A protein has these predicted regions:
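Anaerobic metallocofactor- and corrinoid-dependent redox/one-carbon enzyme cores
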Residues: 1-433
């Protein structure tokens, strides 16, 4: 076995042995090392304000208003362009965020601890559907929901996870793959398991028993008319919000996947990809043995199904850190576990199996934690090898949401995106040195 193969074996074994557990909730500036009041994190590789896409610019502007640094869009845009605000990838701070991925200093975040290798990873709270900051929206409705998440939702689930003694996210992913999820774009099973695991502790929290609090309540009447009265307990509202949002578990899953990927990073001679991320302008990867160096290329527009009234010309290029799921062997790599997803992203069930089968060509292992019943419980393809990607001319398969190119309009569809091959070629050239 060559030095590279030995290194890749070590890296992927570390990835699969990682044990990410949700242990706490905390304010970003208090718990993420290096965060300061003028630093805003975003999805993807590094980017300047001038090159940011519409959804990312909108999310940054919304974040500035939410933080009280600007009163309106005009002030926010001027401040963002002034150089007084610093921008950095979530990945530089062991964090991840879906779509625009903006994490502001005062936002509450999931804290995931790797119980095997040590260390922590982070992600923000999921806002649900409709107008949301992660798609660049920042009207009063968006800001109200963000405040409720930070001031009601976060304190309740923080107390709940303490009572529970933590939540094993890896176990939830493994179970969900047996229930029709892929761990990225289809989250119904993961969220159901997430709620089932935490619900009994939510109702036991002191915060959850409150029926009076100063933070404006969310309108949860879409879940049940009961919530129109405004006298439900905070616990009931938290559980109703979780019920209304299939993406409830996604951010914690992403942070758990970041934990697994981080475990494989920094292995000398390894050619494994340990980061994939997009900022709406560029797609970037990092490789285990090349440190913090990014290899980037222009992000492609996903190919998929569009919601009524939208078309391909409305789409923004690929955006978000959620591709960390594919990096560790789920998402598009586990599509065979979730054939129903083709109703959302296009194609037919056979395509889901073809996607997973093709990914075995560019990976170094079959995952010993995540397996697919319909493939005789074969482990998902795990550990993307830059050499194999270039040699076989096969890029990773990623399933993803599609954002509108203008800030604030939101998701306009979902589909499959192929990363640009140039990044992998550049990474291989660097490795050859």
């Amino acid at each position: 076995m060559s030095k590279i193969d030995q290194a890749n074996k070590k890296a992927v074994e570390r990835m699969m042995k990682s044990r990410p557990v949700w242990v706490d909730i905390g304010r970003a500036r208090d718990v993420i090392p290096g965060i300061k009041d003028n630093l805003f994190l975003h999805a993807g590789p590094p980017i300047t304000w001038e090159r940011m896409s519409g959804p990312l610019k909108g999310a940054i502007m919304g974040g500035l208003i939410y933080e009280g640094k600007a009163k309106n869009a005009e002030e926010a845009e001027k401040l963002a362009a002034s150089g007084e605000v610093e921008f950095a990838p979530c990945h530089h701070y062991n964090s991840v965020g879906p779509m625009a991925g903006v994490i502001t200093p005062s936002q509450m975040v999931f804290i995931i601890e790797d119980k095997e290798w040590g260390g922590y990873t982070y992600s923000n709270m999921n806002e649900g559907y409709g107008k949301v900051l992660r798609y660049g929206a920042f009207d009063d409705e968006v800001l109200k929901r963000l405040r409720w998440l930070d001031e009601v939702y976060a304190p309740v689930i923080k107390e709940a996870v303490h009572l529970a003694g933590g939540m094993d996210i890896k176990s939830i992913i493994a179970q969900a793959l047996h229930m029709g999820d892929d761990g990225h774009n289809r989250n119904r099973a993961t969220t159901s398991l997430f709620i089932r695991t935490i619900a009994s502790f939510v109702v036991e929290t002191d915060w959850g028993k409150k029926t009076e609090y100063d933070t404006p309540r969310l309108d949860l009447s879409n879940v049940n008319e009961y919530f129109k009265g405004g006298k439900a307990t905070a616990a009931a509202e938290v559980l109703a919000f979780m019920h209304s949002n299939d993406l409830t578990s996604l951010n914690a899953i992403m942070a758990a996947c970041k934990s697994m990927a981080l475990a494989a990073h920094g292995v000398e001679n390894s050619t494994l990809v340990t980061t994939m991320a997009r900022n709406g302008t560029d797609f970037g990867i990092r490789v285990s043995s090349t440190g913090d160096k990014w290899f980037t290329a222009p992000a492609n527009v996903p190919d998929g199904l569009y919601f009524s009234g939208f078309k391909a010309s409305d789409a923004n290029p690929d955006i978000g850190d959620s591709v960390i799921t594919e990096t560790v062997g789920i998402g598009g790599f586990a599509m065979a576990a979730a054939p129903a997803i083709v109703n959302f992203i296009g194609g037919n069930p056979a395509d889901a199996f073809d996607a997973t089968n093709e990914m075995y060509e560019i990976t170094v292992a079959e995952n010993n934690n995540f397996n697919i019943p319909a493939m005789d419980f074969r482990g998902t393809p795990t550990g993307i090898d830059v050499r194999k990607v270039v040699e076989k001319n096969i890029v990773p398969r990623i399933n993803t949401g599609i954002a509108h190119k203008e800030a604030g309009i939101g998701q306009v569809g979902a589909g499959i995106v192929k990363p640009p091959m140039e990044m992998f070629v550049e990474a291989l050239k660097e490795l050859a040195k």
